[in-house]
Amino acid sequence: MYKIVPDTNFLIYVFKHKINFDYEIERALNTKFEIVILSPIKEELERLLKSRDLKGKEKLAVNLALAKIKNYKLVDYTANYADEAILNYAKENENVIVATNDKELKEKLMENNIPVMVVRQKKYFEIFGMV
């Protein structure tokens, strides 16, 4: 079974653009999976919600993401930054696919032969790397 680990921006993007998260993962992967939310991602979403910088669709997307991640497996993970947590978790565990559109994080993941799931054309997911 694959573990799908989304980063914060991926979650916000998905809910901002009303993409059916679970369906798109199933369509792109076509096998069993579980969605894993690392604690730094949840904490980052909570921090964003409290900040005054978010308005409109972004604030709604963060609210939706926080509500939706309650349905997924939450893993306590200690790291200084969310991206660091994602990269280390992916290195330490098998069958991990990281969902991100962050260019820098994608490059680090690909350097470590970790598959990456991205959003294409604001509506569907595509996986790069060895699966």
From Swiss-Prot:
HAMAP family the record matches: VapC_Nob1
Name of the gene encoding the protein in the UniProt record: vapC4
Domain PINc: 4-106
Function comment: Toxic component of a type II toxin-antitoxin (TA) system. An RNase. Its cognate antitoxin is VapB4.
Entry's family note: Belongs to the PINc/VapC protein family.
UniProt keywords, alphabetically: Hydrolase, Magnesium, Metal-binding, Nuclease, Toxin-antitoxin system
Domain of life of the organism encoding this protein: Archaea
Class of the enzyme per the UniProt entry, highest EC level: hydrolase
Protein name as it appears in the record: Ribonuclease VapC4
Cofactor needs: Mg(2+)
Binding site for Mg(2+): 7, 102
Annotated organism of origin: Methanocaldococcus jannaschii (strain ATCC 43067 / DSM 2661 / JAL-1 / JCM 10045 / NBRC 100440) (Methanococcus jannaschii)
Matching Pfam families: PIN_9 (PF18477)
